[in-house]
Design a protein with these regions (language model features):
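Accessory alpha/beta interaction modules
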Residues: 1-67, 77
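Short, charged alpha-helical interaction segments and adjacent helix-coil junctions
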Residues: 1, 75, 81-158
Length: 158
C-alpha cells in the first residue's frame, strides 16, 4: 500500500502544479518525503531514495523529476550525515533535551509555539481527520531545483 500512496501523492502534487495549457516541461521536480518510525523495506537503512527507472536498461537515465525519500528514524545502515541522524532522533523524541544543535533548537521552539497556538492545533487536527489516520508522520516537500531534500534550518542534502 505504501508505494501506491507515494504514487497518489506525486499525482496529486503534479496535477496541482500544471495549469491548463502549460507544457509538461514546466512541471517542477517534486520530492515526497516520508519520515517513519518503522522500516518500510526491512533493510535497516536510515535513507531510502526511490526514483523511476527503465527495467530493461537500468543504467538508462530517466529523469521524470519525481523522487521519493523514506527516512527511517531508527535505521543504522548506510552513511547518512550526522545532522540528519540528529534530526530524525529529534523527530521521534521531540524534547528540548534532544534538540542538540542550533537548528534543532530553532525547530523545537517552532514546534512548541505551534502546540501552544490553539488555532494551529485545531487546523492540524482537522487536516488529519480529512486525510485519515496514518501510522507514519508524512511530509510532502516540493523542491524546485536539483535532487535535494531539505532538513531543519534549510540544510540541503543530496
Amino acid at each position: 500500500a505504501l508505494p501506491r500512496r507515494v504514487r497518489f501523492y506525486h499525482a496529486k502534487i503534479d496535477a496541482g502544479n500544471l495549469p491548463s495549457g502549460e507544457t509538461y516541461g514546466s512541471l517542477r521536480n517534486v520530492v515526497v518525503i516520508f519520515i517513519t518510525t518503522y522500516d518500510p523495506f526491512g533493510l535497516n537503512r536510515m535513507v531510502y531514495t526511490i526514483k523511476n527507472c527503465c527495467v530493461e536498461v537500468p543504467e538508462l537515465k530517466y529523469e521524470d523529476g519525481a523522487q521519493t525519500i523514506f527516512l527511517y528514524t531508527r535505521g543504522s545502515e548506510g552513511n547518512p550525515p550526522e545532522e540528519l541522524k540528529q534530526l530524525l532522533h529529534y523527530m521521534e523524541h521531540s524534547s528540548v533535551e534532544n534538540a542538540s544543535t542550533e537548528n534543532l533548537k530553532k525547530l523545537h521552539r517552532m514546534v512548541t509555539a505551534v502546540k501552544r497556538d490553539g488555532e494551529v492545533g485545531l487546523a492540524y487536527m482537522n487536516s488529519r481527520k480529512n486525510e485519515g489516520s496514518y501510522k507514519a508522520w508524512t511530509q510532502i516537500r516540493k523542491v524546485r531545483e536539483g535532487n535535494y531534500f531539505i532538513a531543519a534550518g534549510g540544510t540541503a542534502y543530496r
